[in-house]
């Protein structure tokens, strides 16, 4: 594996959009066939969690863009993310001809997870851990598909923000990082794409409330990753497979987040 590993974070409503998911994995298959570059997918699945909790008659709230996760809800959330979402991603990979292995953040000690904030409940802070298992899986030609469920050192299941999880995994692997979501990148106050975003501008936009909630979490994770990895991190959309192939080949798509 001479080529730099690429970590792609998949988010937003992608998992509930079968047509978009099919197109995305078709693009990833083309990329893998042409580039022969090690690839790791990291996913959340907030929409599945919302649907499940609603069906169970349970409420769900967010604080500063992070889902508040009462400990009594974590079995359901883990089931939705590490179970349903992960296996749906794997199924799509397999149907596209990509051999895949489903993982969570705890497998092989990939990430070290601790409780982030008692006010958020079973929400984890994620730090890079041991990449050996994932490196071995990549060396065997498999695509690791990693859910954002972690486990603390004392055995507590934790819900981790998928942007933060992808950042920690990229750090552990020394990989490049691309974050894909519903939107085309980071948008300014007028809804226009910001092609390049540095730390000073990002902090200014967050202070003004232009970047807030989930997008603020994403930008903070991207800034942290850019700082730790010492390279730009791309925030873009999964909606346009042709643009995605250009992006994966090194083209300018979405927002490049730098220091």
UniProtKB/Swiss-Prot annotation:
This is Acetylglutamate kinase. Catalyzes the ATP-dependent phosphorylation of N-acetyl-L-glutamate. Belongs to the acetylglutamate kinase family. ArgB subfamily. It catalyses: N-acetyl-L-glutamate + ATP = N-acetyl-L-glutamyl 5-phosphate + ADP. It is found in: Cytoplasm. The gene is argB. PANTHER family: N-ACETYLGLUTAMATE SYNTHASE, N-ACETYLGLUTAMATE SYNTHASE, MITOCHONDRIAL. It comes from Aeromonas salmonicida (strain A449). GO terms for molecular function: acetylglutamate kinase activity; ATP binding.
């Amino acid at each position: 594996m001479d080529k730099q590993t690429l970590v792609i974070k998949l988010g937003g409503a992608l998992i509930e959009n079968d047509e978009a998911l099919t197109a995305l994995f078709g693009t990833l298959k083309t990329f893998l066939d042409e580039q022969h570059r090690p690839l790791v997918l990291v996913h959340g699945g907030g929409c599945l969690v919302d649907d499940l909790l609603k069906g169970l008659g349970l409420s769900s709230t967010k604080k500063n863009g992070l889902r508040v996760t009462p400990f009594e809800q974590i079995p359901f959330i883990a089931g939705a993310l590490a179970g349903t979402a992960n296996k749906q991603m794997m199924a799509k990979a397999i149907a596209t001809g990509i051999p895949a292995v489903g993982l969570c953040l705890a497998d092989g000690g990939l990430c070290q997870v601790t409780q982030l904030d008692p006010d958020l409940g079973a929400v984890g802070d994620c730090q890079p851990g041991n990449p050996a298992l994932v490196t071995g899986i990549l060396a065997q030609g498999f695509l690791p598909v990693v859910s954002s469920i972690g486990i603390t050192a004392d055995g507590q299941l934790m819900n981790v923000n998928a942007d933060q999880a992808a950042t920690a995994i990229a750090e552990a692997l020394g990989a490049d990082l691309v974050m894909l979501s519903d939107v085309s990148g980071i948008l300014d106050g007028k809804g226009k794409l910001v092609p390049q975003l540095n730390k000073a501008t990002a902090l200014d936009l967050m202070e003004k409330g232009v970047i807030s909630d989930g997008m603020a979490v994403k930008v903070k994770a991207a800034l942290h990753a850019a700082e730790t990895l010492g390279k730009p991190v791309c925030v873009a959309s999964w909606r346009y497979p042709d643009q995605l192939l250009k992006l994966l080949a090194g083209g300018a798509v979405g927002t490049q987040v730098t220091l």
